[in-house]
Amino acid sequence: MWHRVSIGVATALGLILLAGPEENAAEDSVQQAAVAAGKAALPVPRFVSLKSDKVNVRKGPSTDQSIVWVFSRAGLPVEVIAESDNWRRVRDSEGADGWVFHSLLSARRTVLVTPWSKGEERIPLYGSKSTSSRAVADLQSGVLGSVLECDGEWCQVSVDDYSGYVLQDRLWGVYRGEEVK
């Protein structure tokens, strides 16, 4: 699996860091305050991203539980599918799930471009919300991007030095029809 490293396996993976921690400090502090207050006012399921390039995924919601793998890509989107105190059960784009401590997750929204596609398919990053508009870049499957906004059909994303629009159903990290502001 290209974004998880099993314990005992040394795999070099490229990192893509799209935003600094200060950009999302306000979002993260709101999320942490809600959790600290014992109010899980956040919906489950929901998408979040990894804060670090080393995130231990455990069999259960405790440091006493064994580490089953390690995520090694900061910014990777994961889906929170359950909560237990300060632990979040997350699922990755390949469907694998496990438990992660809440402070290793960020409310910053990120996406993977067609992670289910195994071919050389390229997804256009359009200059506007139209398939007839000019493509500013072609994105490979598995490219990580930051979500700027989504309207339920299109998402405006930034990838490296490029910004543009991708059809929402070509992305993992946002729900079909979801609006993100």
Descriptions of predicted regions:
Residues 1-9:
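Bacterial N-terminal signal peptides that target proteins for export
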Residues 8, 23-24:
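N-terminal processing/targeting junctions
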Residues 8-16:
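Bacterial N-terminal signal peptides
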Residues 15-23:
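C-terminal segment of classical bacterial N-terminal signal peptides
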Residues 24-59, 70-74, 81-84, 91-93, ...:
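SH3-family beta-barrel domains
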Residues 156:
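Extracellular/periplasmic metallocenter environments
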